[in-house]
Amino acid sequence: APRSSFEDTVKKTAAEAAQKSDRPTSSQGIKLTPLEREIDVDQIQYEHINIHLDRNLGAAHIMIQGPAKLPPDDVSAINPMGDRFWPLALARQIDDAILHLRLNETEIGTWVFHTQGDGNMVAAYDNLLLENASDWLVREIILYLKRTLKRLDVSSRSLVTLIEPGSCFTGTLLELVLAADRSFMLDGLFEDQPESVSAFLRPTSMNFGPLPMVNGIT
């Protein structure tokens, strides 16, 4: 297209592509608000992620919090939740954290992943997404999770996961274990936390197809 009509051509092409979408014309998109992120000398805090930087060891300890409440019963409730919907919020925050550590913390060569929360709640969110995968918004959220995990997979850092009592490496979060170069699982409980739930891993259907690596293998 000539430069004089380039902008109009782009708009026309985008409109034609949008018409092919299966998203109902009455549906509204979600506004992605700026991420809430606080950066300190050795700490980065998001809503669902806390990162502690151990500069002496060149390691970033990345603690991911599982969902605080169960997902809605109906897929129609996801849109009103906007970017606060846990899987979408988590994907955005992990994506941002990966890029921040890659670009701004080049001396941090090891990323150590921890999780904390209720694995049953993580599984419930996975089930909601999978049962409604044909919904346009759910599909986009799953694709966002897939892209984010691919970005992690190709990051030139040593990836470690620590599977500890009270962790929730279930379904989508189990992908962190599968992507890691090394994983360590504690057998038993910490002496000062006898009330904790023993460490466990729990796959869901999210681990068997929807989230392939860059090579196409799950």
Task: Report each predicted region and the residues it spans.
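Intrinsically disordered, low-complexity segments enriched in small/flexible residues
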Residues: 2-157
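Conserved catalytic cores of soluble enzyme domains
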Residues: 1-28, 134-218
